[in-house]
A protein has these predicted regions:
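Accessory DNA-binding and partner-docking regions appended to nucleic-acid-acting proteins
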Residues: 1-109
C-alpha cells in the first residue's frame, strides 16, 4: 500500500560499523598503518577490528598475514588450549607481535 511504501523510503540506511569502515579502506589497498592514520585510530585498534572481522568470517587470516607467518603461528598454537596469550608471548618473545597472536587466535573461531 501507499502508506507502507512511503514509510519504507524514510528508513535510513543503517550506519556502517567501525569494522566496515576499516574493511572498506582495506579493500582500497591501504595498509593497517595507513588505515589507522586515515581514521585517526591506533594501529592496535585496527588490528582489533581485523580480529573481529576474522571471527565474523568476513576476512581470512591469510588476507592479512603472510603464509609463512601463519605457518609459524599454527605451530606455536598447536598445544594452545585457550589460555592466556601471555604464555605464548613469553615462550616465543619477539617472534610474534601481540597483534599477530590475537589475529591467529581470532581465526581459531
Amino acid at each position: 500500500s501507499y502508506y507502507t511504501d512511503s514509510k519504507k523510503k524514510k528508513t535510513k540506511e543503517p550506519k556502517k560499523s567501525t569494522y566496515e569502515d576499516t574493511l572498506e579502506l582495506w579493500k582500497q589497498n591501504l595498509s593497517i598503518y595507513e588505515i589507522a592514520k586515515h581514521r585517526k585510530l591506533t594501529p592496535q585498534t585496527i588490528y582489533n577490528h581485523f580480529a573481529k572481522l576474522i571471527q565474523m568470517e568476513i576476512v581470512q587470516l591469510s588476507d592479512i598475514l603472510p603464509e609463512d607467518k601463519i605457518s609459524d603461528l599454527r605451530a606455536a598454537f598447536k598445544d594452545f588450549k585457550g589460555e592466556s596469550l601471555g604464555e605464548l608471548k613469553e615462550i616465543h618473545g619477539d617472534k610474534f607481535s601481540w597483534d599477530e597472536l590475537r589475529l591467529y587466535k581470532a581465526s581459531l573461531g
